[in-house]
């Protein structure tokens, strides 16, 4: 059965389509900035709400609450855009984002602050998938990978600029609350741009209804998964003591979701016209890419502090090599996929990322002094390896989104885009919770093993020597831990490359006109 696009977008002039996708990308960038903006001002926020600086774990919900709201709302809002139109959902999401920003800026305690961040996350959960769906509506499938890669680049640019944006706002206005007050006029401007650029919704009685029950069950399953994988004391265990019941609850919720979807009349994705094999392959590869991304975001900074003995600012700057490479890779990947196909670029991108992580896993303790010697020239090892990994992960953003959208009918672009992003974000959360907890647990194991191998001191101990010995042991334990973590990440990327072989191709798709 062949489906044709039901949106009027592909008949619009290129200039009008470009303005529309530019407005959507601006909304995506705004949401992405706020995902990472708190990183650079977290200590200011802690002081403002009365949390001691040595209790930083108490403000974890500021970040995780945003991400969980983002993920939980995304499937429902993506499907709502299929039902009610891209313009309306984008505008409602931007309005919700502004409201959440106001609540966050007015916060006087942690509860109010987290509530505002959750509202922001829920609202932001619509911006990326709905804009991706808009790109799929406005461009034929053979040409859309470039557009989707550009949207992905806007998302990744937020990760680069977010911390800098936070510092700039504090420097200009003198308070961290300015970050969120500035969001209000920016959101209003974006709402106006969307109103005048995004095509109006064409009423279609055959459009799918919103599966509220299915979306809620999926949100519960994902939320419990993250809670079950997060260890508050990784020194004792890589998993928390409540892991078994909570993960079991996640499994039950996911099973209930599957049962509901198999019997319900209204589903998140109607099976008619969907090629589930390539679609699930794109989701699985996106999940793996998300896990690799989060392992890098978390652990390069920690490596800088634990192994290279940098302060926080210098350690964060280390990550800039990777973060700058991501959006560049996203733009290049979309352009290449338009010419050579999504499958081949997705596979190559994951293999390049795997090679980058393989190189990172071999970093010596003095990696800042290490170089790659190519005979006629040398390249700094740390910079080069991070750029390789970043380019590789960036390359797959557009092709995986395009491949997933190609194998579903146009009427379900919103929910399909949402599930691709959900898969990626779920991978990020799993990477942060599971590999992060496991990694710190491995640090303490390595630390204790090194201590057991050291000869017992004889005579009166020298305090300075003991301090230096302890420092050297910590650096070695951290280095061994990160080598293991990035080696595992390389394997994950290779597995993702194999999975990407099974995503859709131009030749086998027939859902839309070319």
Curated annotation (Swiss-Prot):
> In terms of domain of life, where is this protein from?
Bacteria
Organism phylogeny = Bacteria, Bacillati, Actinomycetota, Actinomycetes, Mycobacteriales
Q: Which GO terms describe its molecular function?
A: lipid binding; transmembrane transporter activity
Induction (free text): Part of the lrpG-mfs (MAB_2807) operon.
Sorted alphabetically, which Pfam families does this protein's record hold?
Answer: MFS_1
Q: What is this protein called?
A: Triacylglyceride transporter MAB_2807
The listed locations are: Cell inner membrane
- Its predominant location is membrane
Q: What happens when the gene is disrupted?
A: A double lprG-mfs deletion strain is more sensitive to the antibiotics tetracyline, vancomycin, rifabutin, clofazimine, novobiocin and ofloxacin.
Topological relation to the membrane, as annotated: Multi-pass membrane protein
Similarity comment: family membership: Belongs to the major facilitator superfamily. P55 (TC 2.A.1.3.34) family.
Site (Forms salt bridge with Gln-157, probably closes bottom of cavity): give the residues: 424
The free-text domain remark for this protein reads: Has a canonical major facilitator superfamily fold with two N- and C-terminal domains of 6 transmembrane helices (TM 1-6 and 7-12) and two other transmembrane helices between the domains (TMA and TMB) that form a hairpin. Between TM9-TM10 is a periplasmic beta-hairpin that extends along the membrane plane, TM11 and TM12 helices extend into the periplasm. Asp-34 is a possible protonation/deprotonation site.
Reported function: In association with lipoprotein LprG probably transports triacyglycerides (TAG) across the inner cell membrane into the periplasm; TAG probably regulates lipid metabolism and growth regulation and plays a structural role in the outer membrane. TAG (and maybe other lipids) enters the central cavity of the P55 transporter from within the cell inner membrane via clefts on the cytoplasmic face of P55 between TM5-TM8 and TM2-TM11. From there the lipid is probably transferred to the hydrophobic cavity of LprG.
Q: Spell out the coiled coil positions from the record.
A: none
Give the note.
Answer: Bacterial LAM blocks host cell phagosome-lysosome fusion and is one way in which Mycobacteria evade the host immune system. Triacylglycerides accumulate in lipid droplets in the cytoplasm of M.tuberculosis stationary phase and dormant bacteria, and are used as an energy source during starvation.
- Region described as Beta-hairpin: 371-380
Q: Which GO terms fall under biological process for this protein?
A: lipid transport; response to antibiotic
Gene3D superfamilies named among the record's database cross-references: MFS general substrate transporter like domains (1.20.1250.20)
Question: Which species is listed as the source?
Answer: Mycobacteroides abscessus (strain ATCC 19977 / DSM 44196 / CCUG 20993 / CIP 104536 / JCM 13569 / NCTC 13031 / TMC 1543 / L948) (Mycobacterium abscessus)
Gene name of this polypeptide = mfs
TM annotation in the entry: 19-39, 58-78, 88-108, 118-138, 157-177, 178-198, 210-230, 239-259, 278-298, 316-336, 344-364, 385-405, 420-440, 485-505
- Keywords linked to the UniProt accession: Antibiotic resistance, Cell inner membrane, Cell membrane, Lipid transport, Lipid-binding, Membrane, Transmembrane, Transmembrane helix, Transport
Q: Name one GO cellular component term.
A: plasma membrane
